[in-house]
A protein has these predicted regions:
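AAA+ P-loop NTPase catalytic core and its hallmark functional loops
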Residues: 1-166, 173
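Alpha-helical lid/collar subdomain of P-loop NTPases
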Residues: 138, 147-223
C-alpha cells in the first residue's frame, strides 16, 4: 500500500524477476467479477470450452500474480480469492474442478488507499495478506532516480527538480493543494518533453500543473 508512484508495481515485478517466476499483471476495476479472474465458458470450434483467467493460469504455472489496485474492485468479486490466499491454496471452478495452486505461486496486491474510486477491503481479504507500507521517496533517492533516468541532466537541475517535487509534497501534506499534482510520473514525463525541445514551463504544465483542473489550484502549483 502507498501513494502513487512509490514503486509498488516495480517492487512486485522485481520480486518475480528475483525468484525467476513468470508474472501476471491483473488490473482491477469496478466492473471486475469472479469470471474475469478465474475464467469463463466460451465457444471455440463449435464447442463450449473453459477460457482460463489470469489467476487460474498463474496458479497452474507457479507464477507471481500482481493484483494491481485491488481496492478498485467490489468485495463480492474478490471473495473468489479467499480460498486461493489461505491454507486451502486452491481454486474452485464452478462446474469443473478444484484446482490446487502450484507450490511456487504467490500473489501480490497493490493499492492506493483513500483515492477516488477506491473502496475499503473487507477484513476477511485483508487478513490474508501481510501489508508493506511503501514510503514516499526521499530527496537522496529522488536525485539518484533523476540521474539514472536523465544522465545528461546538470547536477544543479537534478537538485532543483528534486526540491520542486518535495515542495509539492509539503504543500500536499499541509493541505494547500490536492495530491493530483504530486505526480512523480508526471515530473519524469515533463523532463522527457523538455529533452525533446518543449519549453520548461509548458512541459511542467502538461506533466504536473494541469493534473489539477481548478484554475486557482493551478496558480498555487505554479508558485
Amino acid at each position: 500500500a502507498g501513494g502513487k508512484a512509490t514503486g509498488k508495481n516495480v517492487l512486485a515485478e522485481n520480486l518475480a524477476a528475483a525468484f525467476g517466476r513468470p508474472a501476471w499483471d491483473i488490473s482491477f476495476h469496478v466492473n471486475m467479477d469472479a469470471a474475469s479472474l478465474i475464467g469463463m465458458d466460451t465457444f471455440e470450434g463449435g464447442q463450449v470450452t473453459f477460457r482460463q483467467g489470469p489467476v487460474y493460469r498463474c496458479a497452474q504455472c507457479g507464477g507471481f500474480g500482481v493484483l494491481d489496485e485491488i481496492n478498485m474492485a467490489k468485495n463480492e468479486a474478490l471473495a473468489v480469492l479467499h480460498a486461493v490466499l489461505d491454507f486451502r491454496r486452491a481454486i474452485d471452478v464452478p462446474g469443473y474442478a478444484r484446482i490446487p495452486l502450484a507450490e511456487e505461486t504467490r500473489f501480490i496486491a497493490t493499492m492506493n488507499y483513500g483515492y477516488a474510486g477506491t473502496r475499503e477491503l473487507n477484513e476477511a481479504l485483508t487478513s490474508r495478506f501481510v501489508v508493506i507500507q511503501m514510503p514516499t521517496i526521499t530527496e537522496e533517492n529522488l536525485e539518484k532516480l533523476l540521474r539514472a533516468q536523465f544522465s545528461d541532466l546538470n547536477a544543479k537541475y537534478v537538485h532543483q527538480f528534486a526540491m520542486l517535487f518535495l515542495d509539492l509534497q509539503k504543500k500536499c501534506d499541509s493541505a494547500e493543494i490536492s495530491t493530483k499534482a504530486l505526480d512523480l510520473r508526471g515530473m519524469l514525463d515533463a523532463l522527457r518533453l523538455m529533452r525533446r525541445g518543449v519549453p520548461a514551463g509548458a512541459a511542467l504544465d502538461m506533466g504536473i500543473t494541469n493534473k489539477a483542473f481548478d484554475s486557482y489550484e493551478q496558480s498555487l502549483i505554479r508558485d
